[in-house]
Amino acid sequence: MYEIGKPAIYGSTLSLSPDKSLLLIATVHRPYSYQVPVYNFPQKFEVIDLQGNSIYTLADNPTINIPMGYDTTSPYPRQFGWRSDQPATVYWAEAQDKGDPKQNKTDFMDIIYQISYPFNSEKQEVAKTEKRFRNILWNDDAFALLIETSRETRKNRTFTFKPCSSESPVLLFDVSTDDNYNNPGNPLTVKNAYGKYIVYINKAHNELLMLAQGASPKGICLTLAVTI
């Protein structure tokens, strides 16, 4: 057992790269505030090695004052994570409407970017979302699932897409968050060579397998095969 990095106030982001060589971390720093919650305090997002050396700074965000309203968010880079299908690639979202869709109308609320170790190239656009970015479920360079959400309409939309491609995403599901009967659930995942979960594709039939609890007295589990 040994210490990695320096003593600090660490945020909620702390994860090991799929190839187990790097750490993605967030540290909280001053000035603190009584006017915003702790997760909106200034935070620095960076990649360090397993000896604690800083490798790359992704963002150094100031205090965040998120306005009231549906689908508002941070105007700064957010939702950092590792691509589960690559050895050491970080992705994140950036609001194109400065975090306030009512004050700043845009065709796309968010753009998702990525950058790969050794972080000596420009960030690369992964995808765009018309609504607020929620998540990406990875498979490989040719296929992933992109999920966007709207608190205003209470809807989640799931698309199939090719990461970092000019091809338009294809809508797969458009479901109300209040409609449990038609909720397709979550895709079945399997572990890849890095030990990370990726979306399972039944290549024999070009299908995804979806798992859902269901909302019927006759059963609590539903498996759905979806052609992609």
Language model features by range: what are they?
Residues 1-228:
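Beta-propeller folds
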